[in-house]
Regions:
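Extended ligand-binding clefts on enzyme/binding-domain cores
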Residues: 161-162, 172-267, 273-284, 296-330, ...
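Asp-box/WD-like beta-propeller blade repeats and closely related beta-sheet repeat scaffolds
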Residues: 133-169
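Bacterial Sec-dependent N-terminal signal peptides
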Residues: 1-25
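Helix-capping and short linker residues that terminate individual alpha-solenoid repeat units
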Residues: 52, 83, 99-104, 129, ...
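Aromatic-lined, polymer-binding surfaces characteristic
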Residues: 64-68, 72-75, 107-125, 159-171, ...
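CBM-like carbohydrate-recognition segments
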Residues: 25-69, 78-90, 94-97, 101, ...
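Acidic interhelical loop/turn segments
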Residues: 153-154, 267-269
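Acidic-glycine-rich active-site phosphate/pyrophosphate-binding loop
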Residues: 40-48, 91-93, 135-150, 195-204, ...
Length: 363
């Protein structure tokens, strides 16, 4: 081996060793009270103790809502990754009444926001192998594609950016539970189609095609959905390259809009809009996942992810409720509408991605 070859070999070894160590440094040595293990446990326990929610309204819900589904899913993955059997037991106990007196709360899977419920029983099956959970979740995943379009998409497709998480996670979970690649192929096709149709030249996504605003949480669902998909999509899958390209393009754009405090804003490219925590947690989750899997440059994105997490911690109440969560928002082609949206504390739109972040740090 000549001197030049030896130098290149040593350099390659150094890069292979140093890069993981760099991200380990950024994702450890947390200030007191801010570690993902501590925060994740607090939020998961708080969720177990919280009755079923209804989008911030005082009356009880008529069905399990999608923010609760997203939080339940995050709590389950955190409990598994932290090997916290007590948390897992509490999360399973929360589900028990849905097989009995609360069966009426199971959503009818005729719409994206309802069908996403399937992600929870499918995750429980993945962890427990209890057949009743697979039967429930798989039936919903199959119904979502009972009448596909000529292009092979679900008839629940509506080209709202939220769907890039809501719709895709059901098919991903069905794939993770069964190993049947038809579910993976469905979700990947759906995501690639949405990317092709909706991603803007700057890498971000309008809230709707006729509403040209980059609303934080809407884009957050997209970022989280792509991160989830890429974790399961094989390297040779035909949809992986376009999804990876869309993901990396979005992450590059987001990096320039992160505030000095680590937090993104209600409208991503409007720094005068308020700091918004649900979108920040979703973007942070996507970046943690990208760094951990080697999809993103660690030197650029590991510090951004750390800064995002620590910024979020400053909005946490002692009981685990996070502040500055934008209320559920329908589209409207009016800037002031987004600037004036109410900020909630403890809304599950914010609790959920905090748990996703805690899980991502532990993976």
């Amino acid at each position: 081996m000549n001197r030049t070859t030896k130098l290149f070999t040593l350099l390659a070894i150094w890069i292979a060793v140093a890069a993981p160590l760099y991200s380990q440094k950024e994702f450890s040595n947390w200030p007191a009270g801010s570690s993902p293990q501590q925060i994740g446990k607090k939020l998961a326990q708080h969720f177990i103790e919280t009755p079923h929610t209804n989008f911030g309204r005082p009356e009880p819900p008529t069905q399990i809502t999608y923010p609760e589904v997203a939080t339940w899913y995050g709590a389950l993955t955190f409990a598994k990754l932290s090997n916290d059997k007590e948390l897992t037991a509490g999360l399973l106990k929360r589900f028990d009444p849905l097989f009995g007196p609360e069966a009426n709360l199971i959503p009818n899977p005729i719409h994206v926001d309802n069908t996403v419920f399937a992600a929870v029983p499918l995750e429980i099956y993945i962890q427990t192998k209890q057949q009743k959970f697979l039967d429930m979740g798989k039936a919903m995943a199959d119904k979502q594609w009972a009448n596909p379009t000529p292009d092979g998409l679900s008839d629940q497709t509506r080209f709202w950016i939220d769907d890039m998480f809501m719709l895709v996670i059901v098919q991903l979970q069905a794939y993770r539970a069964t190993g049947d690649t038809k579910y993976l192929d469905r979700g990947a096709l759906e995501m690639a189609t949405y990317l092709d149709k909706l991603q803007q030249p700057n890498g971000l996504f309008y809230h709707a095609p006729d509403v040209p605003f980059f609303w934080g949480r809407g884009d957050g669902w997209v970022a989280a959905g792509m991160a989830e998909m890429l974790q399961s999509l094989p390297k040779k899958h035909p949809q992986r390259a376009p999804i990876m390209a869309g993901y990396q393009k979005m992450m590059k754009s987001l990096l320039q809009y992160q505030g000095s405090d680590g937090v993104w804003h209600q409208l991503i490219d409007h720094p005068e809009s308020y700091p918004e925590t649900s979108s920040t947690a979703m973007f942070t989750f996507a970046m943690i996942t990208g760094v951990k899997n080697g999809w993103l440059d660690k030197k650029s994105y590991a510090p951004a992810a750390r800064k995002g997490w620590l910024g979020l911690i400053t909005y946490l109440e002692p009981n685990g409720d996070i502040r500055n969560v934008c209320r559920g928002t329908a589209k409207k082609n009016e800037l002031q509408y987004y600037l004036d949206r109410e900020r909630l504390t403890g809304d599950l739109h914010g609790q959920a991605p905090m748990l996703w972040c805690a899980s991502a740090f532990l993976r």
